[in-house]
């Protein structure tokens, strides 16, 4: 997260605290309400279900071998985890939007074995390519960071995007192509079928219906 954004959050927290009577308790917290992107993940090759507990800054790990999710482990991660992806049966990457980090979690022992710093407001991560790379969308800087999972200390490659707030990521079945959903793409498209406005090839707004 940029210094400016962090300053805004700090001022907001201080202003909220100043309006309260008495002292703020030690367990006070601020709900940033970060948007979930990929909060659930079934781990291939295991009986584990992963879930991001955004408000409590934890990765919740469940065992589903009985057909019903049973709590197995709860791992503290960064602030506001919004996405989780399993790299394999023993490792998961958790995207922490407010912390601007990736928590690499050991699923067998239930701890964060490495923390990666990212650009502002990371949103999602996906593994693709040969050799394998980890692609991380950063909505605050409109870019994708490309990490080498085999060497997390190496500097990431940066891919700049045209569009604002890239979020969810997906890949082709063969893993050779990565797709990014952009919240504000600016390409004149919409999911609403409102018809054209005055023949200028712009979808009419605001008809919130499908024609």
Label each region the model flagged.
Residues 22-211:
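Predominantly soluble domains enriched in secretory-pathway, periplasmic, or organellar proteins
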Residues 1-9:
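Bacterial N-terminal signal peptides that target proteins for export
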Residues 8-19:
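Bacterial N-terminal signal peptides
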């Amino acid at each position: 997260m940029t210094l400016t954004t962090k300053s805004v959050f700090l001022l907001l927290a201080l202003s909220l605290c100043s309006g309260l009577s008495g002292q703020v308790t030690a367990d006070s917290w601020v709900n940033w309400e970060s948007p979930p992107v990929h909060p659930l993940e079934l781990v291939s090759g295991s009986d584990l279900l992963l879930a991001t507990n955004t408000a409590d800054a934890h990765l919740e790990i469940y065992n589903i071998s009985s057909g019903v999710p049973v709590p197995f482990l709860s791992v503290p991660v960064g602030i506001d985890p919004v996405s989780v992806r399993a790299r394999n049966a023993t490792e998961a990457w958790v995207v922490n939007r407010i912390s601007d980090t990736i928590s690499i979690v050991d699923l067998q022992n239930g701890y964060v074995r490495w923390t990666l710093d990212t650009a502002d407001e990371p949103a999602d991560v996906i593994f693709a390519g040969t050799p394998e790379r980890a692609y991380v969308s950063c909505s605050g800087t409109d870019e994708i960071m490309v990490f080498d999972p085999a060497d997390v200390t190496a500097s990431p490659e940066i891919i700049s995007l045209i569009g604002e707030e890239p979020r969810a990521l997906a890949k082709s079945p063969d893993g050779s192509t990565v797709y990014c959903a952009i919240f504000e793409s600016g390409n004149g498209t919409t999911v609403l079928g409102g018809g054209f406005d005055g023949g200028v090839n712009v979808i009419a707004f605001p008809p919130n219906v499908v024609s």
